[in-house]
Structure formats: C-alpha cells, structure tokens
C-alpha cells in the first residue's frame, strides 16, 4: 500500500513516500481505506524524536492519528463500505497510509455533510476541545471562557464547542485571524499583537490551547474558583490534573481519548449546524514533506489535511 513513513527522527525531509506492507488488524480492530488524514502537532513531535518516552513502536513508523475513509471490514453498527472517521489512540498512529488498522471503538460514521478532508480534520482537535471544556473545565451555560490560540486546529473547534455548551467566548488570536474567529461564534476577540490577554480578570475558565499561557500567569485572570486547562505538559501539570479532578486544584492537562460516543457527539453538532471543521489547506499525500513544513510554522488557520487517491 502507499504510505508515508520515517525510519529515523529528524526534520520533515526524513519522511519517505512509498510502499509499505498493509496492516493486519488485531482482535477488536478493523481496516479502513483512508481517503484523508489530518496532521497534528503530535506528528511533528514524534517525527522529531521529542517524545521518545512514549511507547510508539519501532521504526520505520507510519505517522497520523486523524482519518476519514471507508470500512474494509464490518464494525458494530457499521457494515463494510461505510464511510467513517476517527482518531487512532495508539501513539504509533498509522493513519497516513492507504489502509489503517483501527480499534472499533475509535471510529464512527462520517457526518454526511462533510467531505472526507473535512471529516479527517475533526477527530483529534474536536475531541481535545470537547474533553477539555466538558471534562477538565466543566463549563456550564453562561460562564465566561478564554481560549488562548483560537484560530488553529483545536482552537477553531473549541470556539464552536464552547458556544454549543452555552458559554461566553473570549478568543485570543492574531488580528489576521480575528474575522474567522468571530465568524465561528466568538463573543469577543483579543488580538495578542496589540492587546495583553493576561489583563483579563474574573474569568470562569482559561483554556491554553497554544501553550504559551502557563498556569502561573493565567491564575490571575481567573476568579477565586476559576479553572485552567492546557494542552501542553508543564511541570506538575499531570499531578495537578489528578488533584483538580478530585476537587483539590484548579489546573489540569487535557489528555485526549478517542471515544466513539464523543465522535458521535461531534457528528451531531455538525449535522445540526453547530460545528464545522476549518481546513487551512489540503495536499496530496505525496506532498507530506511540504505539509509537515507548513504545520511547523504554527501559522495554520484550522487543519492541514493529506488526501489519498483510490
């Protein structure tokens, strides 16, 4: 099968475009013919060797977590040939190939109103936003939440999900992305190039998506019972997360989990017009090096997606 892989750690140029053996699904897994695979920062970190402490399998390795495609095997409630989307939980990934093996609990029926590229842009970023806002922060209608990094893959979905959950959204992004973020539903936009987001006070929640607003700076922005969540590990963040879930602390790290029920929740929002993924650019799988280079600029508005022709 056609696949993107790397046999050593390094810059985007270590990515190889070529043939790899088709995967054999284990018990509880199915094969998906991948039509589109979205990129995520985790792909970059693993390719660079920055997360070698994670059990991600041996090299060579096929990257990729987000996918949309068609089932080559039947899954519960989804016959062979069904259009599906999902996120592969295992650290080794494997979605950046013509065929991926996926646990049956990590995929769901593709929202009918989305293209394959749009559907592939939804899972990891959408699950991260949902699980941070709902589970780690516990947002409720009427609360005020600040989203730091509102124009990227997670951020564009977090704006919409926070609105769907009934909150007032204060979005932080650059001026060039302000119109997009307002269009997605933000109640107020802070242009970090001309305003200081940390001047905000009395917030119910701060969700640091971009990773440059650590807890020591963010806590002054919150009221006395306000909560903070980040996507980026910080010293003590995992411990604080456990304490926060026990009601003993106000800061947490979101660790995304691929769950069919949550994928279906995202899909329902899409169907009802409350959520749409934002795709910055779509490239053929053979342009994987260029796609990774662009993702590393951290300038993408929404997601970068690779497509496979079948």
What are these regions (language model features)?
Residues 83, 144, 168, 226-227:
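Short glycine-centered segments of the SAM/dcSAM-binding site in methyltransferase folds
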Residues 65, 85-149:
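NAD(P)H dinucleotide-binding glycine-rich loop of Rossmann-like/cofactor-binding domains
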